[in-house]
């Protein structure tokens, strides 16, 4: 059995900024409205989101016998100006950075069977981080942490090992705030979901099609930070 406090201590030692642990159970539709999002076609041509939808909701379908999801946060500097390249892309390639730390954490914990997850595996990094008490899902659908706002990269270890204790989700800090919704120049945010067909980051990150004339890229060529810049939790960083 793994020690929750031991996991968190080692996670910090290998370079993460925060760590939480959740039991490997299915996410609810209210936590992660994936099916509703897909039914509306708000995923655009991100066809891969349709595949393995059940695994995205339940890590036990991703890793047979999974019992714990170890979620880790790596914060990055907020942008100093708007436009051009989004803040996450101005630092080292986060997939490599986060995965390298996850591999080190897995080795230190002695759980070689644990699956390393960072964006490219069919599991929702942000929703599991929320389940593990590291923050909450903002209206812009990103994880908002109390310490670093949404300027964070995420990764997980899904393991068959049980933990001696688990973290609990935090209450939302958004309350009646709608600043991120109002800030989006393309009105891409609605009902706590993103219509990627209206989202600048969809076009400037995936580059699968030209930006439509009615979508304002607002000067961004890689990603977009507009909704994050509007968030009060990001203004205190």
Please describe what each predicted stretch is.
Residues 26, 179-211, 217-237:
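Iron-sulfur cluster-binding cysteine motifs and their immediate structural context
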